[in-house]
Amino acid sequence: MDAIPAVRQPQIQLPITVQLPKIRVPAALSDPRLVQILSLGILLGAGVFVRDFSIRPAQIILTFLFALTTQALCWRLEPNKPRSLRSAIITSLSLSLLLRADNLLAHPIAAAAAISSKSLLRFRGKHLFNPATFGLIFALLVLPGSWVSPGQWGQDVAIAGWVVAFGMLVTNRVHRGDISWTFLFFYGGGLAMRVAYLGQRWAVWTHQLENGAILLFAFFMISDPMTGPNARRGRVAHAALVATIAYWWQFHLYAFNGLIWALFIAAPAVPLWDAIWPARKFEWTQNGGDHEIVHASKTAPCDCRDCSRDAVRAA
């Protein structure tokens, strides 16, 4: 009997690995402020066309015009600082989202005051107040016919979800999500205790936290890296302080605009937190990298995630 020839097994060839060239994103496009501008712009567009915000196109145009013009004038006071209009655009969008007035002058004047405060009200190299917050308080105190309308957002779950999503994109890029979530923890905890004390249904609590104004404040205002504490522990303490003042303002004084007033009143405490917990100051850089911390101080430690990873690798 003839022998059966052996069956030759086919050879399996592994796929060839092709290494694609790395695509470098231009430095200007990796700036987190562009993400914030896009997010606020989408929210403003949704508010105007979906929520029917009571703001006229002329008010928005004048807000941008006066903010950008004031920023250009302020550069004369600080000729050595890097020049960028992105922060002024963010302030203009924030004022357009929150400020309401029955005349055309309130918005541009508030915008000019907000941008001017960055150059005039400074302490140890940092501007003291969040520009949008200062502009809102200035309008409420000085400009008649002005008000802040937090109720315009309603309690729409979809809008709340988009605000949180956009906010997380921004805060993660600048490593400031800790202050946003800490504020929501303390403020939400105060609301929860009040609901329990009054014997209300927990649907009231979730209804309050779904307010777009609270989420916009948490992710786009208190998280401002230029006016917040430098150290993580300072940011946690500051968020707790702002949440406490906001709760006291709203539920003990029964006054309006507790969030805005709380951030304004607590602003002078930021230098105190920086003195207790020294850390390197945040600065916007021109390289547009994911790490936006300028190591200006050689003695103060930096507690951001990138520096922590570098320290572990060095050890």
Residue ranges of model-derived segments:
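N-terminal signal-anchor module of multipass membrane proteins
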Residues: 2-75
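C-terminal transmembrane helix-loop-helix hairpin of multi-pass membrane proteins
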Residues: 15-38, 190-297, 302-304, 315
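Hydrophobic, membrane-inserted alpha-helices
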Residues: 40-46, 67-71, 87-96, 110-117, ...
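Central hydrophobic cores of alpha-helical transmembrane segments
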Residues: 132-136, 180-189, 235-243
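Internal active-site segments that recognize and position negatively charged phosphoryl groups
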Residues: 143-200
